[in-house]
Amino acid sequence: MDIKTALSRIVGHLDLSTAEMSDVMREIMTGQCTDAQIGAFMMAMRMKSESIDEIVGAVSVMRELADKVELKTLDGVVDVVGTGGDGANIFNVSTASSFVVAAAGCTVAKHGNRAVSGKSGSADLLEAAGIYLNLTPVQVARCIDNVGIGFMFAQSHHGAMKHAAGPRKDLGLRTLFNMLGPLTNPAGVKHQVVGVFSQALCRPLAEVLQRMGSKHVLVVHSKDGLDEFSLAAPTFVAELKNDQITEYWVEPEDLGMKSQSLHGLAVESPAASLELIRDALGRRKTENGQKAAEMIVLNAGAALYAADHAYSLKEGVALAHDALHTGLAREKLEELGAFTAVFKMENEG
């Protein structure tokens, strides 16, 4: 099916099949569509609302066209990732949590990009920390093997997305493409914590990942609007485990944490986010640093559970607390910077 035929269907509020959506996405991502067609398609899909079949079709093509990272095993390898777009502008919780997860002895294949709507995307933060981003898939795999954590810069692995970049920027609205990043990890991880910008997306995206072969995933959105677990409000979870999806709410107190406001955790730049994270992963000299540490522990604990490194969310949080307080997470951050510096010299001379 071509994009013109698809548009006429979607405008009539008819869903596309998985195969039809795959045809259209392949057409878009191989440069066969005009910007006007892509923009119209994205808006029509948004107005109709994307079906699970359509998201699966889009994800399948993005995964097919990605520059993949080949790992020795995917057992227990986890990604902590969010769609962004929650408007909260708090520090990079998922990225900071990834280093705690690695410090706890779990392997992390982190996928991320620059900020779209917020002040600091994961790539912006890591660049501020001196971590070299423009790695080949083989170099990313070496980071993961040697450091226990590696970062896959989305634009380096999903080059075909460039064809939709102009229309996405011109529209300036959330579209199907905002959902695709967390669902298209180039290493093909089967364990994830996926934060989303709307509770309504939790169950559908869990179903998409179920169909794509994921093993243990938590798709989350907090009642105060975050695309991650919150210290300040209950968090809604759609959990995929043993090929079953269950939905539930989690309070911080359920996991041995104390509820508290997020005041002081918003940042205006990657540098400010990095400063807060370094304090949280280090000696926690400030009140905000201590609060940030607890937010990191909460989300790292969820990742350890999703990776099957812990038997429950509560045990995951306890393991994350211990890992953060050893100081190893901050060491992992510095270690990744040093390791990627070698690749920078190799790649740039």
UniProtKB/Swiss-Prot annotation:
Keywords: Amino-acid biosynthesis, Aromatic amino acid biosynthesis, Glycosyltransferase, Magnesium, Metal-binding, Transferase, Tryptophan biosynthesis. 5-phospho-alpha-D-ribose 1-diphosphate binds at residues 82, 85-86, 92-95, 110-118, 122. Its EC number is 2.4.2.18. Mg(2+) 1 binds at S94, E228. InterPro entries: Anthranilate_Pribosyl_Tfrase, Glycosyl_Trfase_fam3, Glycosyl_Trfase_fam3_N_dom, Glycosyl_Trfase_fam3_N_dom_sf, Nuc_phospho_transferase. It comes from the Bacteria. Anthranilate 1 binds at G82, N113. One of its GO terms (molecular function) is anthranilate phosphoribosyltransferase activity. Anthranilate 2 binds at R168. Its cofactor is Mg(2+). The keyword Metal-binding applies. Pathway: Amino-acid biosynthesis; L-tryptophan biosynthesis; L-tryptophan from chorismate: step 2/5. Mg(2+) 2 binds at D227, E228. One of its GO terms (biological process) is L-tryptophan biosynthetic process. The keyword Amino-acid biosynthesis applies. Homodimer. PANTHER family: ANTHRANILATE PHOSPHORIBOSYLTRANSFERASE. Belongs to the anthranilate phosphoribosyltransferase family. This is Anthranilate phosphoribosyltransferase. It comes from Pseudomonas fluorescens (strain SBW25).
